[in-house]
Amino acid sequence: MRPRSFVFVVCSPHPRAGVTTTATLLTEYFAWRGLPAEGFDTDPYESAFANRFPNQVEVTDISTIQGQISLFDKLLVFDDKPRIVDVWNRSFQKFFTILQETGFAEEARRLSIEIVLIYCADELPASLVTAKQISMLWPDMTMIVAANEGAAEFRANVAQFLAAFPTRLNLHIRELDQQVSRSINKDSFSYAEFLKNPPFDMSIIVRSALRKWLVHVFTQFQRLEQQQVINSTEYL
């Protein structure tokens, strides 16, 4: 099988869709797997993703040429390190304009770098419309549609909601109980380390609920990762 490198683009055209949470969970998943990821945060102001992983995530302002070079050139490096981009909703349009104008996706494919788009959806009509537009512009790009119940409100059945999007790959992040969420220091708490070595000074109820929530997410990441490996046989 031909080796490949992976770039994960986590994005949404709207705020409060769970982009940073999803990027964080994916980073923690790779840490749990023993594969430290390299991250990029395109929000130059609050930079929540970079603040969470100061030694792994670089802040890039893609409204500037310098920021664009810093991000996109580094994404075209072929190695075994997964790269994760947290696309700020205000950078969303600019990010995809650059992809289109530079032929970035085609260059990445030439270098055996697979772009995996994790599209964080919500129930606003523009969310589905934008996903379909991206799918039409880059039909060969892998798209995973994510529903994060802790960030966006879903009145409809989540499975039915996800089925409307132009991909059969999906990710469902359940809402974490508020009491459990308040029990951990999100800025310094490592989900990967928690799964490896659960703290015994944590409430057994909180520990059980958090583990169940994480296992549900990480199992989906594992399934999606295996699916990508299977799909790689197309490029032999």
Where are these regions (language model features)?
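Extreme N-terminal, non-catalytic leader segments
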Residues: M1-V9, D73
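Glycine-rich phosphate-binding P-loop
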Residues: V9-L26
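Short beta-strand-centered segment that lines the nucleotide-binding/catalytic pocket of NTP-utilizing
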Residues: R33-A48
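P-loop NTPase switch/communication element
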Residues: Y45-D61
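Loop/turn-to-beta-strand initiation segments
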Residues: D79-I84, E114-V116
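Switch II (G3) loop of P-loop NTPases
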Residues: K81-L99
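Inter-motif core of Ras-like GTPase G domains
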Residues: F96-E123
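Beta-strand-loop-alpha "switch" segments that mediate conformational coupling across diverse proteins
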Residues: E149-V217
